[in-house]
Swiss-Prot record:
GO cellular component: cytosol
Stated name of the protein: Polyribonucleotide nucleotidyltransferase
Protein keywords: Cytoplasm, Magnesium, Metal-binding, Nucleotidyltransferase, RNA-binding, Transferase
Location(s) in or outside the cell: Cytoplasm
Superkingdom of the source species: Bacteria
InterPro entries documented for this protein: ExoRNase_PH_dom1, ExoRNase_PH_dom2, ExoRNase_PH_dom2_sf, KH_dom, KH_dom_type_1, KH_dom_type_1_sf, NA-bd_OB-fold, PNPase
Gene3D superfamilies in alphabetical order: GHMP Kinase, N-terminal domain (3.30.230.70), K Homology domain, type 1 (3.30.1370.10), Nucleic acid-binding proteins (2.40.50.140)
GO molecular function: 3'-5'-RNA exonuclease activity; magnesium ion binding; polyribonucleotide nucleotidyltransferase activity; RNA binding
Pfam families tied to this protein: KH_1, PNPase, RNase_PH, RNase_PH_C, S1
Length: 734
């Protein structure tokens, strides 16, 4: 059955959803279109029952942008799409985080969602369309799913909110936030903004939610027409008798443990001991009661002897105990109050050869952030469907297994690391100076050395501090905090600066970063259905208090960026030259620019608009290169002294010397030395570098060419201080 429906979101933004034409062997498939951007999403969920020991939902979301969608060839030697780009990974995470909470508890079938961008108008980003398509594909399938989910992007231009702004509109927008939600609630947020207030954030979310409701209704209509019954599944759960036995055995020791304000490692050891003791106790009891014949007669009896089932219910009791402690007693695992931030310590300049560094420690979460400054040549080339750009500010996040006291694979960057690094990067980039103010390429690397919650927000704080330590003139410092939520019916508690356990056992992870004047980035994941706006409002207000507290601690360490960049950072200078002089600076085959680099030790980059950036290890090298370039592009003037190169010898006439690229002059035989010169080659050889003075400029009457008369003798007649004065020194630097 082919179905196509559309909805107009205003401003000519029409979204079309269709199903029944393509990929019909998948459990569900849809195509979503806006403008000329189209995505196809498919979903397949295994019908093989999961293992009785499985306690997680193995869902995989793949988002791929096909280069043919924009009529482009993939870059590089191999002309086909290969591993996912950072943009594709971030888009996949965006969709995964919005969909995952909507699958029913206990549904553990292997599920794969593949979203492919098959057409791109290079105006509309396809990531939010991919979220809509994925949800719609599940809705028209027989896979159990709570309700439809839609994603939109919200921008704001001149104070007016815009749904799904184009790339051109986003360039003018002070908000770029992706929102995922259902008819009733918001389940995912991620975005960046130019220091907006908490009230403005809520307003943007409400605006986006209205559009989400319309798109969800469209999905519901399509699903109703398809009318495919949802498959049944058996959620593996402990029998009631077993649950009661486990609760009786473990509730008291877990409650006693919860009220102990312990460090992470000690709590983990004691918790493991409780799990082991209770599991052995339960197994010992039922091994004596249940025989092989009992299991043959009633296979569910095997669950009483399943360590995974027992451990899973102990975990459920642990979660319940912690949540009640917070809701009933306003007490947290480490003894803090609900709004209290963990102790903070900061050290700057720890890495002697780095261009800037900071060690930011908050409780048991620690980030070492290191700054590297480079030239424009160090910028990251970005090749996507939408555009080809250069990225001059990067923040990379590394999460080694030792940071949580574990062993693990060390190698390529994982999706989580890419996602956390991107969030921290978006938070800080709003205060990074423009290229005209600070022409460096900036790379910050956050090494997570310890982790017990909110390592991405520790990276935001550490990155700000490392940049300021390295003399990067950030407009304002940025801090970040992770908020949590515990909610049971109408009773709830919002937690500031959550621990790893509070994130794992809680209902929300809401990261907010910003300056004193407003929010610069946020990310929210919800594990429950039904987040009320008044809870969101409280979380935002509480996050502001925590953010300002952390900023106070940061400014105690360093209030303003250092006045100079790090000792070992390259020194950059820029000059502007006429566009028609670019060729003169570069020279034939790059000969001139290479020569300047060899002689001065400076690296030179020339942009198409005539901006010349000089990078050098010291100021003297840069100054020499600048003076050389200025001389190269200047017009020859009588009296100017040049360091030239002998190009040709005429024994009875003199020597032709190149004083500027493609500009030669004649040193007449009479201007070579004070004494009489009989043979030019006795004094000069081809290729010699000699200092000459321009003594005359005239136009040849017959050819019309400009002739330059040069003299070596004129410099010999000059006093030493004149011959080595500013103009002569200028040429020595060439």
């Amino acid at each position: 059955m082919f179905i196509r429906k559309e909805i107009d979101l205003g401003d000519g933004k029409v979204i079309t959803i269709e199903t029944g034409k393509m990929a019909k062997q998948a459990d569900g498939a849809t195509i979503v279109r806006m403008g000329d951007t189209m995505v196809i999403a498919t979903v397949v969920s295994s019908r093989t029952p999961p293992s009785p020991n499985q306690d997680f939902f193995p869902m995989q979301v793949e988002y791929r942008e096909k280069y043919y969608a924009a009529g482009k060839f993939p870059g590089g030697f191999i002309k086909r799409e290969s591993r996912p780009s950072e943009k594709e990974i971030l888009s996949a995470r965006l969709i995964d985080r919005a969909l995952r909470p909507l699958f029913p508890n206990g549904y553990y079938q292997d599920t794969q969602i593949i979203i492919s961008v098959i057409s791109s108008d290079q105006l509309n980003d396809a990531d939010v369309l991919g979220g809509i398509a994925a949800s719609a594909a599940i809705m028209v399938s027989d896979i159990p799913f709570a309700n439809s989910m839609s994603e939109v992007r919200v921008g704001r231009i001149n104070g007016e909110f815009v749904i799904n702004p184009t790339i051109n509109e986003l360039a003018q927008s002070d908000i770029d936030i992706s929102i995922g939600g259902t008819n009733d609630t918001i389940c995912m947020l991620e975005g960046e903004m130019n220091e907006i207030s908490e009230a403005e954030m809520l307003e943007a979310i409400r605006f986006g939610h209205e559009a989400i409701k319309k798109i969800c209704s469209l999905q519901d209509d399509i699903a109703a027409e398809v009318n495919k019954p949802k498959r049944s599944f058996l959620a593996i759960d402990a029998p009631d008798e077993l649950k009661e036995s486990i609760k009786e055995a473990c509730e008291a020791p877990l409650k006693e443990l919860a009220y102990m304000p312990l460090a992470k490692e000690e709590r983990a050891e004691k918790t493991t001991a409780v799990y082991k003791s209770i599991t052995e106790q339960i197994l010992g009891r039922y091994k004596n009661e249940i025989t092989a014949e009992d299991i043959a007669a009633d296979p569910s009896k095997a669950l009483y002897l399943n360590e995974q089932i027992i451990s899973g219910h102990i975990h459920a009791i642990e979660k319940q105990v912690m949540r009640h402690m917070i809701l009933d007693d306003a007490k947290r695992l480490d003894g803090r109050k609900l709004e209290e931030v963990r102790p903070i310590s900061i050290e700057l300049g720890l890495i002697p050869r780095a261009h800037g560094s900071a060690l930011f420690t908050r409780g048991e979460t620690q980030a070492l952030v290191v700054l590297t400054l480079g030239t424009k040549k160090d910028a990251q080339m970005i090749d996507t469907l939408l555009d080809d750009t250069e990225k001059r500010f990067m923040l990379h996040y590394n999460f080694p297994p030792f940071s949580v006291g574990e062993t693990g694979r060390v190698g390529g960057v994982g999706r989580r690391e890419i996602g956390h690094g991107n969030l921290a990067e978006r938070a800080v980039k709003k205060v990074v100076p423009s290229e005209s103010e600070f022409p460096y390429t900036i790379r910050l690397v956050s090494e997570i050395l310890e982790s017990n919650g909110s390592s991405s927000m520790a990276s935001v704080c550490g990155a700000t501090l490392a940049a300021m330590d390295g003399g990067v003139p950030l407009t304002k410092p940025v801090s970040g905090i992770a908020m949590g939520l515990i909610k049971e019916d109408d009773n709830y508690a919002v937690l500031s600066d959550i621990l790893g356990n509070e994130d794992h056992l809680g209902d929300m992870d809401f990261k907010v970063a910003g300056t004193r004047d407003g929010i610069t980035a946020c990310q929210m994941d919800i594990k429950i259905d039904g987040l009320d706006y008044h809870i969101l409002e409280k979380a935002l207000e509480q996050s502001k208090n925590g953010r300002l507290h952390i900023l106070d601690k940061m400014t105690e360490s360093i209030a303003d960026p250092r006045g100079e960049i790090g000792q070992y950072a390259p020194k950059l200078s820029t000059i502007q030259v006429p566009v028609d002089a670019i060729g003169m600076i570069i020279g034939k085959g790059g000969e001139t620019i290479r020569s300047i680099t060899e002689e001065t030790g400076a690296q030179i980059n020339v942009d198409d608009d005539g901006t010349v950036t000089i990078s050098s290890p010291n100021g003297e090298s840069a100054a020499a290169a600048i003076e050389t370039i200025k001389t190269l592009i200047s017009k020859p003037e009588v009296g100017t002294i040049y360091m030239g190169k002998v190009k040709d010898i005429r024994e009875d006439l003199g020597a032709f010397v190149e004083i500027l690229p493609r500009t030669d002059g004649l040193v007449h035989i009479s201007e070579i030395a004070r004494e009489r010169v009989n043979k030019v080659s006795d004094h000069l050889k081809q290729g010699d570098r000699v200092k000459v003075k321009l003594i005359d400029i005239r136009k040849d009457q017959r050819s019309g060419k400009i002739r330059y008369a040069l003299s070596i003798k004129a410099l010999l007649d000059m006093p030493a201080e004149s011959a080595n004065g500013p103009s002569a020194q200028e040429e020595q630097n060439q």
